[in-house]
């Protein structure tokens, strides 16, 4: 065994062994229970960053731990390979996106292998491969034929820099999530998936996802945004049309003092032709962001249309305004404004001097101060005709019944969630498999013509997709009538590819179907790991897609991910690592200098997985020193020859104490990892154990036997975290099978039993001493020993003992006055 810890040689040896033995190649025919552990696959940017390393280290540690527990583990890896950065890189470097992407995949694959991650590389996939996205196209056509896909002209979020449409979730404070450009509003034809058909199930099933963080579930609940209310109509005076609105507060109906129209409402657009103030609002809406946080804080601006609506219950005439805080895509683009009971309505009314009429008063009789702001709570109705005096909940039902009886409204459920617009005006994405015929309209590409393959040898110059200028791609014949037709040149939103990749990993070599029975064997994913920033993007879409796959008979489970771990960010100097801040750390440089095990150990030791990790150069150096010390402990032990068999009955008190420390460490690590995945505290326990082993200068046969057991325990606990060194040390400790095949250690309950315990002694809750007693000592014995302590006597002398609190094995507290 080498005198010095040589991580480069040790890691190369272990990685070669795993590859030669196909150690991590999962097989479905195992009699062991399955465990599917998956970390969100990366975009192939070319180099791993520390966020990647943390994410994938957590996943690998969980996978290796579960393997030691006897599970048949699947841990695959692939590439979320489509997307805008490849096009941007192509423009900067003059390299086609396909070539740039595949070169990056090769580089990152080698980095991942160098970190020792136990992936089943036989299942590797890249979403830019036609054999992957052909099945996405196939499913899209099936959903089109079922009516779950439709095309519509819609107001969309247009990113003027990236020249593409963004989903609402991709607009962050009015700016594009990638480019940072101010988003504009445009009307263009789009393909949509009817995710709203699944809104109820997506919402209700969240209650069953008890393996998910509550924060993520709440984010999805809020995004789906189910609300019960009443849809009602206001006639427009002098016009043969109505304004339809949805309200969750019909109890405030008598407080309506104006109507609000979105700038993009058809009536607003009509009036804008002759009304400059309205035209200005329309233009502002088309060029401004639509994020709700943006709208909530934006200055309230509007224009009086001169139109009046007629109140459905009182007949009162109500002015109609165009208001910049009303969104066209939510509901009908019109709202009934109740400024006394809605803060945005109040701010607008205050700006323009519109009436503010309170009709709901606090139930406790508190005075309303409408001058200070809206009262938005429930309460008791006033000035509401026959409904005055009713509590809000009763008034909700009574007013809804009245509106329904008079044919002016009906109760309904509304969602904040909107259908998923999946069209992108970009090149580097999966082609949408539709053909546009002048006579037949949109026609799906026949199954036997799939995949519609993306041409890869292109030049990217910016200003839209090159597909639009490639007749060889878009010119085709209509599958129905044979006439000249054109292919769709939009490509899929890249979230389409990441919405089902987890299932494809189960059968990545299947070329005759989207999925086969292996997908049912492995899904749902038992442990999914990734960033919380994907809570309402990828994670919601993946849940929807999985339910679609279920309804198509391709999987039988209802949800894709049983447990979700959202890892914390990697920080340096208190802020997230990023190139723009110049505070990044290159993991490859650390691997080259210290070895992969050191990087893995620091990553798992510095913080619990779900909390932010603060980068520390000294922490990395400390991790390296610990591994060097562990290597030295094993080296020195092995140099003395094979250790004899352990006889627990033949141990001295000192040896028994050390053995107890070994098994306490096993028990703690098993509890920390098994229940909470807090590997950092398990590592700390192993470090303490190694300190104790290092201090044990005992060359006797029994002493060496305890040392052998202790070193084996340390190696087994660390094996998922620092697998290369533990692979090496396990063989050095005399084993012929690799540590990766060894079971997780179990604590010997007999070894944990203590003959004596040290009790903390308190007087009136303050520490006054310690006493050592037999482990089975009762309260009477503990009290006698405590009161016999000299320091305790000082604090109880001349006082009456009122009570004694005894916690067996831990403390005794004497209450004296």
Swiss-Prot record:
GO biological process: leucyl-tRNA aminoacylation
Alphabetized UniProt keyword annotations: Aminoacyl-tRNA synthetase, ATP-binding, Cytoplasm, Ligase, Nucleotide-binding, Protein biosynthesis
Name of the gene this protein is made from: leuS
Motif ('KMSKS' region): 576-580
EC number(s) reported in the record: 6.1.1.4
Coiled coil: none
Record motif 'HIGH' region, residues: 42-52
Reactions performed catalytically: tRNA(Leu) + L-leucine + ATP = L-leucyl-tRNA(Leu) + AMP + diphosphate
Gene3D superfamilies, per the entry: 3.10.20.590, HUPs (3.40.50.620), Isoleucyl-tRNA Synthetase, Domain 1 (1.10.730.10), Valyl/Leucyl/Isoleucyl-tRNA synthetase, editing domain (3.90.740.10)
Protein name: Leucine--tRNA ligase
Database matches in Pfam families: Anticodon_1, tRNA-synt_1, tRNA-synt_1_2, tRNA-synt_1g
Binding locations of ATP: 579
GO CC annotation terms, alphabetical: cytosol
GO molecular function: aminoacyl-tRNA deacylase activity; ATP binding; leucine-tRNA ligase activity
Protein location: Cytoplasm
InterPro entries assigned: aa-tRNA-synth_I_CS, aa-tRNA-synth_Ia, Leu-tRNA-ligase, Leu_tRNA-synth_edit, M/V/L/I-tRNA-synth_anticd-bd, Methionyl/Leucyl_tRNA_Synth, Rossmann-like_a/b/a_fold, tRNAsynth_Ia_anticodon-bd
Lineage of source species: Bacteria, Pseudomonadati, Pseudomonadota, Gammaproteobacteria, Chromatiales
Family: Belongs to the class-I aminoacyl-tRNA synthetase family.
């Amino acid at each position: 065994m080498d005198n010095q810890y040589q991580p480069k040689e040790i890691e190369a040896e272990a990685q070669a062994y795993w590859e030669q033995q196909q150690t991590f190649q999962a097989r479905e025919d195992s009699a062991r229970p399955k465990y599917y552990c998956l970390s969100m696959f990366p975009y192939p940017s070319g180099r791993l960053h520390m966020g990647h390393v943390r994410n994938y280290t957590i996943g690998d540690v969980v996978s290796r731990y579960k393997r030691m527990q006897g599970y048949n583990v699947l841990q695959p890896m692939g590439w979320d390979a489509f997307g805008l950065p490849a096009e941007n890189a192509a423009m900067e470097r003059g390299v086609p996106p396909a070539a740039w992407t595949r070169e990056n995949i090769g580089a990152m694959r080698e980095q991942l292998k160098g970190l020792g991650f136990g992936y089943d590389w036989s299942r590797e996939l890249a979403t830019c491969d036609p054999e992957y996205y052909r099945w996405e196209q196939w499913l899209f056509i099936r959903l089109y034929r079922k009516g779950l896909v439709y095309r519509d002209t819609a107001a969309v979020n247009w990113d003027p820099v990236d020249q593409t449409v963004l989903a609402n979730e991709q607009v962050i404070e009015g700016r594009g999530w990638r480019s940072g450009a101010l988003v504009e509003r445009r009307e263009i034809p789009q393909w949509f998936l009817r995710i709203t058909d699944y809104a109820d199930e997506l919402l209700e099933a969240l209650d069953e996802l008890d393996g998910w963080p509550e924060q993520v579930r709440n984010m999805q609940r809020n995004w789906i945004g189910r609300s019960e209310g009443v849809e009602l109509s206001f006639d427009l005076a002098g016009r043969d049309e109505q304004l339809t609105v949805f309200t969750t507060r019909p109890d405030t109906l008598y407080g309506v003092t104006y109507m609000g129209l979105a700038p993009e409402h058809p009536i607003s657009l009509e009036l804008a032709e002759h009304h400059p103030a309205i035209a200005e609002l329309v233009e502002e809406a088309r060029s401004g962001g639509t994020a709700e946080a943006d709208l909530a804080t934006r200055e309230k601006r509007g224009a009086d249309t001169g139109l009046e609506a007629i109140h459905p219950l009182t007949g009162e005439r109500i002015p109609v305004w165009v208001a910049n805080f009303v969104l066209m895509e939510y509901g009908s683009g019109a709202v009934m404004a109740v400024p006394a009971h809605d803060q945005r309505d109040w701010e607008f009314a205050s700006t323009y001097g519109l009436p503010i009429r309170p009709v709901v008063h606090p139930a406790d009789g508190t005075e309303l101060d409408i001058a200070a702001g809206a009262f938005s709570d429930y309460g008791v109705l006033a000035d509401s005709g026959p409904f005055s005096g009713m509590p809000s909940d009763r008034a909700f039902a009574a007013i809804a019944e009245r509106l329904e009886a008079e044919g002016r409204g009906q109760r309904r459920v509304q969602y904040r969630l909107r259908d998923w617009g999946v069209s992108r005006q970009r090149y580097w994405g999966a082609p949408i498999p539709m053909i546009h015929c002048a006579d037949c309209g949109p026609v799906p590409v026949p199954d036997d013509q799939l995949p519609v393959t993306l041409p890869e040898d292109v030049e990217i110059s910016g200003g839209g997709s090159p597909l639009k200028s490639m007749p060889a791609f878009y010119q085709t014949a209509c599958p129905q009538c044979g006439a000249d037709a054109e292919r769709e040149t939009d490509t899929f939103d890249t979230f389409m590819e990441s919405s089902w990749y987890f299932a494809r990993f189960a059968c990545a070599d299947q070329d005759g179907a989207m999925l086969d029975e292996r997908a049912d064997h492995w899904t749902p994913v038992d442990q999914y790991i990734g960033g919380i920033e994907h809570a309402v993007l990828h994670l919601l879409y993946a849940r929807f897609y999985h339910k679609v796959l279920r309804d198509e008979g391709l999987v039988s489970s209802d949800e894709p991910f049983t447990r979700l771990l959202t890892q914390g960010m990697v920080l340096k100097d208190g802020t997230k690592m990023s190139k723009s801040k110049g505070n990044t750390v290159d993991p490859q440089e650390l691997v080259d200098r210290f070895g992969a095990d050191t990087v893995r150990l620091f990553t798992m030791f510095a913080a619990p997985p779900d909390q932010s990790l603060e980068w520390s150069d000294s922490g990395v150096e400390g991790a390296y020193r610990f591994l060097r010390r562990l290597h030295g402990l094993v080296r020195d032990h092995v140099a003395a020859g094979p250790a004899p068999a352990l006889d627990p009955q033949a141990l001295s008190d000192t040896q028994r104490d050390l053995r107890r420390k070994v098994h306490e460490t096993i028990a703690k690590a098993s509890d920390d990892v098994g229940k909470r995945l807090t590997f950092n505290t398990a590592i700390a326990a192993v470090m303490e154990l190694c300190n104790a082993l290092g201090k044990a200068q005992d060359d006797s046969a029994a002493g060496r036997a305890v040392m052998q057991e202790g070193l084996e325990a340390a190696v087994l606990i660390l094996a998922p975290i620092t697998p290369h060194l533990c692979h090496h040390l396990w063989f050095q400790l005399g084993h012929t099978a690799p540590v990766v095949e060894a079971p997780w250690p179990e604590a010997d309950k007999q070894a944990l039993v203590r003959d004596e315990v040290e009790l903390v002694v308190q007087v009136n809750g303050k520490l006054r001493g310690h006493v050592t007693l037999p482990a089975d000592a009762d309260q009477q014995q503990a009290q006698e020993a405590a009161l016999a302590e000299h320091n305790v006597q000082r604090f109880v002398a001349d006082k009456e003992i009122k009570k004694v609190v005894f916690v067996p094995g831990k403390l005794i507290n004497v209450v004296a006055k």
